[in-house]
């Protein structure tokens, strides 16, 4: 039977076309549907013969896991056990959208899930009453097939229905991510957190979204505040990141992948200033580079986006609480004893060393609080 290629009507209800696509899926026919990333072969996962046919057409081995596309984020709960909170934050940010999540299923295996950001295809999924597989194709001699023209040129003889919604907006595959469970890896006085909230978000495929996009969207932000954001607060953020990295058995750079973003700002900062010479030197003595730090002025948005805000002195505490009084309970002095961390600005290297030591003592207590609060929700 010749391919039926149907343009998606921009100015009328596509309900009849939705019904036709659903009927074709249930009959085990070969469809191509659009998404915001690339077009793909659509198949009903309850039809094993149709699923294997699409695997063969796309060069996938028998039994290869395919991504289940859902109509809405709410459908997730029926597919897998509740994921960790940080994964939910990620899905709330990027679903519908170009993110595929590999989540633990009820049987312990991984389930690949996505909610595409294409109204027509989501309407088809919703009307079908179940998720569908939407499978991209990348023939060896053609590379990735992005749009309707590509599929028509290569698979016209094998396609029953192709819904043409024009070129896909992104023309790039989704990013695929999975959560690797955390576990104690480094012996020491503090026990490494084993909650799934601290597992590493591993990118199995980098597509439209970068690693930074994914990690930042899922992370809890911990904000340190001083005056100019050139001495104490950047040093505190860097020391907290280093202590967390050692605890989790990872590098400073990959702490973000484990769900924590340590940031800093100043209540009277001039944006774009480098770290002070003293802080650069004090950090370098413990193997931390602050060369790329640039100061940022504290604002309400930073506070509202942070899980906790730690101020280096009483004046910073007052200023931060005045900016966001509704978050006052989450804004505290870094020193649990209520003392401010001494300001070394303009002093000798020994002054910066004393400040570094005071920050380390305060962090030794505060990090346990942070880990416990995140694990408890």
Q: Where are the model-predicted features located?
A:
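Conserved beta-strand segments of alpha/beta enzyme cores
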Residues: 4, 131, 161, 261, ...
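Conserved hydrophobic residues forming the short capping helix/wall of the S-adenosyl-L-methionine
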Residues: 58, 244-248, 320-324
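Phosphate-binding/catalytic loops
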Residues: 135-139, 200-202, 308, 314-377
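Hydrophobic packing residues within well-ordered alpha-helices of enzyme cores
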Residues: 54, 76-79, 236, 240, ...
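Short clusters of hydrophobic/aromatic residues that line enzyme substrate/ligand-binding pockets
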Residues: 6, 113, 176, 290, ...
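Active-site-adjacent structural elements in enzyme catalytic cores
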Residues: 1-223
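Short beta-strand scaffold positions
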Residues: 70, 311-312
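Conserved active-site segments centered on acidic
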Residues: 219-306, 370-376
């Amino acid at each position: 039977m010749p391919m039926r290629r149907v343009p998606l009507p921009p100015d009328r209800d596509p309900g009849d076309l939705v019904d036709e696509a659903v009927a074709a899926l249930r009959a085990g026919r070969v469809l191509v549907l659009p998404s915001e990333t690339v077009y793909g072969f659509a198949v009903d996962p309850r039809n094993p013969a149709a699923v294997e046919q699409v695997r063969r057409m796309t060069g996938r081995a028998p039994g290869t896991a395919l991504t289940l596309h859902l109509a809405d984020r709410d459908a997730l709960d029926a597919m897998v056990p509740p994921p960790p909170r940080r994964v939910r934050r990620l899905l709330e940010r990027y679903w519908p959208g170009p993110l595929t999540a590999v989540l633990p299923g009820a049987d312990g295996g991984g389930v690949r899930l996505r909610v595409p950001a294409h109204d027509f295809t989501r309407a088809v999924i919703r009307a079908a009453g179940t998720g569908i597989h939407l499978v991209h194709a990348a023939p060896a001699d053609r590379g990735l097939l992005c749009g309707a023209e590509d599929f028509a040129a290569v698979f016209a003889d094998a396609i029953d229905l192709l819904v043409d919604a024009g070129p896909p907006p992104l023309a790039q595959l989704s990013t695929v991510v999975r959560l690797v469970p955390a576990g104690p890896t480094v012996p020491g006085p503090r026990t490494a957190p084993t909650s799934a909230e601290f597992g590493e978000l591993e990118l199995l495929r980098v597509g439209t979204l970068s690693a930074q996009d994914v990690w930042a969207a899922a992370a809890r932000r911990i904000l340190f505040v001083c005056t100019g954001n050139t001495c104490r607060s950047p040093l505190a953020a860097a020391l907290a990141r280093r202590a967390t990295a050692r605890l989790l058995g990872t590098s400073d750079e990959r702490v973000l992948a484990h769900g924590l973003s340590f940031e800093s700002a100043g209540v009277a900062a001039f944006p774009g200033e480098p770290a002070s010479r003293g802080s650069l030197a004090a950090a370098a003595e413990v193997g931390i580079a602050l060369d790329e730090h640039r100061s940022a002025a504290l604002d309400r948005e930073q506070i509202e986006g942070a899980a906790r805000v730690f101020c280096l002195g009483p004046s910073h505490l007052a200023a931060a609480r005045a900016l966001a009084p509704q978050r006052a309970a989450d804004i505290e002095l870094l020193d649990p004893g209520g003392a401010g961390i001494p300001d070394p600005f303009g002093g000798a290297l020994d002054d910066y060393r004393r400040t570094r030591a005071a920050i380390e003592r305060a962090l030794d207590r505060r990090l346990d609080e942070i880990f416990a609060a995140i694990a408890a929700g």
